[in-house]
Amino acid sequence: MTTENEITALGEFNKKFENTYELFKKNLENDEEVGASFAVYQNGEVLVNLYGGYRDRDKKNKWDQNTIVNIHSTSKGIVAMIVAKLIDENKLDLEKNVADYWPEFANGGKESIKVKTLLSHQAGMYGWRQPIDETDFYKWDYVVDLLANQEPYHKADEKICYHPKTIGFLVGELIKRVTNKSV
């Protein structure tokens, strides 16, 4: 069943999920969210694929089914499971250097940073030394190249410093180098 609402909610859903659609629509109509997408697939079947609202707070640019967003922390659980699976399959070794999988990462004096050091936020790679714009977050190759080529902010294993903006790129690129697939 395909649905279109004059106000904001668009998409398709299995009729068993009509309540999900109604909650999504209400959320947008009540201005609880400026814009959003929500999709659920089971065994390749679309159960819910909803989107709507706006891409900006000024409500000038509508959210469409192809709107790309940076999901930040929501990917951490998925990434952790992928890393655990790669370790279990002996495709990734916590004791090996990141550069063994991602050779360019060795630039800037990072040749001896271990996978476990990167995963535990002790690599000193919590930011970009070169100023970047928020729109750069959508340019994967650009931001991972910057990270690969820069020096760390401190010596690896010297201290723990949360990598909130870079960890997704760092571990995501490591996974990509091991599996030839993006997260």
Residue ranges of model-derived segments:
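Glycan-recognition surfaces in beta-rich domains, encompassing non-catalytic CBMs
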Residues: 84
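Catalytic-site signature segments of enzymes, centered on catalytic residues
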Residues: 129-183
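Hydrophobic (often cysteine-bearing) scaffold residues that line and stabilize catalytic clefts
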Residues: 16, 20, 71, 75, ...
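Membrane-embedded glycan transfer/ligation machinery
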Residues: 34, 77-80, 99, 168-172
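Active-site helix/loop module of the DD-peptidase/beta-lactamase fold
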Residues: 65, 70, 74, 88-130, ...
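Short, conserved catalytic-motif segment at the N-terminal edge
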Residues: 8-71, 93, 149-150
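Short, contiguous pre-domain boundary segments
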Residues: 1-9
